[in-house]
């Protein structure tokens, strides 16, 4: 039986041009092209950081895993929102005769909002899949962050005051209302690293970053809002974006530009440890994750039954929740429906699937 590992990531623009960024942004927005001013802002951000190394770094990570596991598994790589797209790579795997596939998403934490969006594409009549939900507790990954933060504390902070800010990509509040484990995993991840460092509870905190402006509330505090709200600041802030493993725009711009600039304004020294990227400790964590899961059950994936539809609204969106006073419908959805009209609101289908997942709404 031919087995494979499919390593997946979010993706990035295939070329740093206005239209290249527009294509990527349109994919993220479910095929709806954003307004030109939105594209221009994102394009300007990419120009500010000199492009994005994400695809290069990810391919190097894939090759390093292949060096370790390539004799046992075919190693494949796909993106969620840029080429090579997940469905195209699955077709290639089918052509290659793959029958079982371990899906290793290059995001250490599990969230309905993010990881289930990958699961949507895992459709094959030939291949059975095993999706690894999370792997943030791998000791070598914890050791990476601990070691790199400790270097900053020892070599750059010394005896001066500091605070470690663990930041993670924000998710919409409704994801948490229906049992999403993401926020608990982020807090647990931060605690594990802080314990290894011997930090006191007042020496670190959690914030959120990189939320999208899509008209719905996201979990708080946003990292920039947190900084502005503090009445007193330490001499050093150490920003640790633990929900990511590779350098990309949400680290290189959201942290290294926006957080850095605000620290300059506040008179505080900005620090960020290097990202795991291709470090051997990350590769150890990825390999150990595969080993810890490879004997679990593989199954045929039926995306419409396994996940909510993150990328496209149902054809019957307007019929899903007919009454805007349905008590199970979040307030912001009611407001969206009142403002835009039911036919133009894509969110209720997402909410419905999450309610089903949480057992609060019977499946059809």
From Swiss-Prot:
It holds the Pfam family Ferrochelatase. One of its GO terms (cellular component) is cytoplasm. GO terms for biological process: heme biosynthetic process. SUPFAM superfamilies: Chelatase. Pathway: Porphyrin-containing compound metabolism; protoheme biosynthesis. Keywords: Cytoplasm, Heme biosynthesis, Iron, Lyase, Metal-binding, Porphyrin biosynthesis. GO terms for molecular function: ferrochelatase activity; metal ion binding. Fe(2+) binds at residues 169, 250. PROSITE patterns: FERROCHELATASE. It catalyses: Fe-coproporphyrin III + 2 H(+) = coproporphyrin III + Fe(2+). Fe-coproporphyrin III binds at residues 29, 118. It is found in: Cytoplasm. Its EC number is 4.99.1.9. Involved in coproporphyrin-dependent heme b biosynthesis. Catalyzes the insertion of ferrous iron into coproporphyrin III to form Fe-coproporphyrin III. Belongs to the ferrochelatase family. HAMAP family: Ferrochelatase (MF_00323). This is Coproporphyrin III ferrochelatase. The lineage of its organism: Bacteria, Bacillati, Bacillota, Bacilli, Lactobacillales.
């Amino acid at each position: 039986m031919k087995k494979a590992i499919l390593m997946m990531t979010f993706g990035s623009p295939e070329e740093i041009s206005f239209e290249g960024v527009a294509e990527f942004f349109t994919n993220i927005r479910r095929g709806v092209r954003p307004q030109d001013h939105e594209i221009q802002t994102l394009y300007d951000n990419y120009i500010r950081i000199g492009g994005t190394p994400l695809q290069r770094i990810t391919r190097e990570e894939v090759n390093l895993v292949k060096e370790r596991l390539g004799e046992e598994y075919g190693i494949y790589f796909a993106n969620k929102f840029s080429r090579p797209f997940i469905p195209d790579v699955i077709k290639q795997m089918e052509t290659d005769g793959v029958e079982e596939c371990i899906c290793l998403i290059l995001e250490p934490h599990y969230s309905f909002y993010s990881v289930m969006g990958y699961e949507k594409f895992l459709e094959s009549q030939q291949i059975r899949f095993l999706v690894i939900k999370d792997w943030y507790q791998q000791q070598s990954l914890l050791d990476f962050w601990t070691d790199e933060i400790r270097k900053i504390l020892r070599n750059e902070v010394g005896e001066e005051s500091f605070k470690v800010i663990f930041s993670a990509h924000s998710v919409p509040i409704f994801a948490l209302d229906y049992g999403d484990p993401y926020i608990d995993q982020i807090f647990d991840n931060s605690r594990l690293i802080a314990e290894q460092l011997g930090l006191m509870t007042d020496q670190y905190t959690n914030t959120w970053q990189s939320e999208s402006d899509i008209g719905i509330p996201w979990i708080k505090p946003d990292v920039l809002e947190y900084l502005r709200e503090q009445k007193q600041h330490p001499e050093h802030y150490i920003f640790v974006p633990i929900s990511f493993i590779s350098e990309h725009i949400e680290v290189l711009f959201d942290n290294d530009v926006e957080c850095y600039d605000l620290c300059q304004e506040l008179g505080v020294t900005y620090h960020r440890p290097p990202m795991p990227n291709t470090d051997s400790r990350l590769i150890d964590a990825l390999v150990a994750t595969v080993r810890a899961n490879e004997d679990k059950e593989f199954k045929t994936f039926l995306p419409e039954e396994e996940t909510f539809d993150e990328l496209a609204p149902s054809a019957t969106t307007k019929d899903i929740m007919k009454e805007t006073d349905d008590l199970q419908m979040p307030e912001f959805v009611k407001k969206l429906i009142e403002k835009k009209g039911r036919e133009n609101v894509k969110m209720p289908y997402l909410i419905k699937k999450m309610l089903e997942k949480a057992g609060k709404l019977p499946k059809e």
